[in-house]
Design a protein with these regions (language model features):
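Conserved AMP-binding/adenylation subdomain of ANL enzymes
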Residues: 191-206, 213-279, 283-288
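Conserved AMP-binding/adenylate-forming core of the ANL superfamily
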Residues: 20-64, 68-72, 89-94, 144-149, ...
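Gly/Ser/Thr-rich phosphate-binding loop
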Residues: 252-256, 264-335, 431
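Conserved C-terminal "lid"/linker of ANL adenylate-forming enzymes
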Residues: 407, 432-435, 440, 472-514
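AMP-binding/adenylate-forming catalytic core of the ANL superfamily
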Residues: 88, 105, 360, 366, ...
Length: 514
């Protein structure tokens, strides 16, 4: 099965169903599956006519209908799409364009200031298409998306179907530690993941897409899986506008990372008890939201219970870019709070020294031009996830830490900091916490929840006293080696990657971030 087959089947089934909705200022615009497919085909044929068959083509931009049409135009033909993080600085984007050997680029209008730098510093880059219909005063080698599509419309030849083992896309990991790696995913990797994920939606089901589109989680679960079921993908134009856009698009389903769920809950919890939960849910969620799928970090089951009070079911899953990306997920029919669900039917799971190992049709081909890193991650056909976990008697998977984050104390005891962090984070005064290993034991580095600090008018000494009292209670229930012996109260939030994960290598830096 190829992504092209999945998309063509969707157009046959759902041709006049609305595929995409988005905001243009205050107006909601929309396109049907048939309309989207026309642009996908003209893009694909245009790329073939321009000689980009078998080439790597980068995309830089936030979620837009032009972005997804261009991406699908690339991967349904015989080229490889390289979606890049639009939030990265110019010099890092230049590095990734060059490291991925990209010879063409689709670029959002917001990134036009980077254009000269790309042309000057990316020697393999032959052509750039701006992700807008009409553009003026473009330098040599730069065109509008309409010019490429017009060429495709007039071209007689269409690209042949790609091979199932051809590289469809190269997705760069966030690089929270060390150099980011380009994950090579084949046509079969993506298609098998789309088919194996057990999510059912009726045609026209509204899905509000709020995650960055270059993420494998967003790209595969929102767009490819959503399109396979005839869903209507609604584009969130900004995280700042997410709650407003929920009331506009009235989604049935959403994908979120835990941090978003926690942020929304704070808004719910801040409302007075006199407001009925049904009224509050209508105001915050838009009135139709039934399910939130989440992954990417630990979510405390507390939030699952709280959201259920508002009629919203939260289902956790587990995955990584290297697995296209989903490995396991909870479903509306089969779920267990605290778990990350049962493994998909197309993957095998085993454990080696507590580490989760994965094998299956969704597992990547390797890291682009990084043979040593590929060999280290893929051993005897098994992908070493770097996550520690276990499976219960009902077949549900649980994670309890990262292998590389393991703290080895001087007495030889091993501690997974995430297990402790998840417990400490339950305190309302704790906004962010990282546990580090020091010479004298474990230290909790905590950034206080500013809303609580302000509401209770806490000064620095009061914050320290309350947190220390909380740690004292925690320590009483723990063996000696798991007790917190040090407390550092931060003035600023931790530095995060563009995927909103705390960069553990930078936890000692406590400075305001731009």
């Amino acid at each position: 099965m190829l992504i092209r087959n999945i998309l063509e089947e969707s157009v046959q089934k759902f041709g006049e169903v609305k595929a995409v909705k988005w905001l243009n200022r205050k107006e909601v615009l929309e396109k049907s599956y048939s309309e989207v497919m026309k642009n996908v085909i003209s893009t694909r044929k245009g790329l073939l006519a321009e000689g980009f068959e078998g080439k790597h083509i980068a995309l830089i931009g936030t979620s837009s209908v032009e972005w997804i049409e261009s991406y699908l135009g690339i991967i349904t033909g015989c080229a490889t799409a390289v979606p890049l993080d639009a939030a990265l600085p110019c010099e890092e984007l230049i590095d990734l364009i060059n490291r991925s050997d990209s010879e063409a680029l689709f670029l959002s209008p917001k990134h036009r200031p980077y254009l000269e730098a790309f042309l000057a510093n990316c020697p393999k880059l032959q052509k750039v298409w701006m992700l807008q219909k009409e553009v003026e005063d473009l330098p040599s080698g730069v065109y509008s998306i309409n010019e490429l599509r017009d060429m495709g419309k007039s071209a007689a030849e269409d690209a042949s179907c790609p091979d199932a083992e051809a590289i469809a896309t190269i997705i760069f990991t966030s690089g929270t530690t060390g150099k980011s790696k380009g994950v090579m995913l084949t046509q079969n990797n993506l298609a098998s993941n789309v088919e194996a994920v057990k999510i059912s939606a009726e045609p026209g089901t509204a899905m509000l897409s709020v995650l960055p589109i270059h993420h494998a989680f967003c790209l595969v679960m929102d767009w490819l899986k959503g399109f396979s079921q005839g869903a209507t993908i609604c584009i969130n134009d900004s995280l700042l506008h997410m709650v407003r856009n929920m009331s506009i698009f009235k989604p049935d389903i959403m994908l979120m990372v835990p941090m978003m769920i926690e942020t929304i809950y704070k808004r719910l919890a801040a409302a007075g008890p006199e407001i009925p939960k049904a009224v509050l849910a209508e105001k915050v969620f838009g009135g139709k939201l039934q399910t939130i799928f989440t992954g990417g970090a630990h979510l405390d089951p507390y939030y699952i219970d709280r959201f259920a009070e508002y009629g919203v079911q939260i289902l956790e899953g587990y995955g990584m870019s290297e697995c296209s990306p989903v490995i396991s997920n909870n479903t509306p029919e089969n779920h267990k709070p605290g778990s990350i669900g049962r493994p998909l039917e197309n993957v095998e799971i085993k454990f080696e020294n507590g580490e989760i190992l994965v094998k299956g049709t969704s597992v990547m081909k390797g890291y682009y031009q990084m043979p040593d890193e590929t060999a280290e991650t893929l051993k005897d056909g098994w992908l070493h996830t770097g996550d520690k976990g276990y499976m219960d008697e009902d077949g549900y998977l649980f994670i309890n830490g990262r292998v590389k984050n393991l703290i080895i104390l001087s007495n030889g005891e091993n501690v997974s900091p995430e297990e402790i962090e998840n417990k400490l984070a339950l305190n309302p005064l704790v906004a962010e916490v990282i546990v580090t290993g020091e010479e004298n034991g474990l230290t909790a580095r905590i950034y206080p929840e500013q809303a609580v600090v302000e509401a209770k008018a806490l000064d620095t000494e009061m914050i320290r006293l309350q947190l220390q009292a909380f740690l004292d209670v925690y320590n009483k229930s723990q063996p000696t080696y798991r007790r917190i012996t040090g407390l550092v109260i931060r003035k600023n939030p931790f530095i995060r990657s563009t995927t909103k994960k705390i960069r553990r290598q930078d936890v000692l830096i406590d400075e305001p971030q731009a």
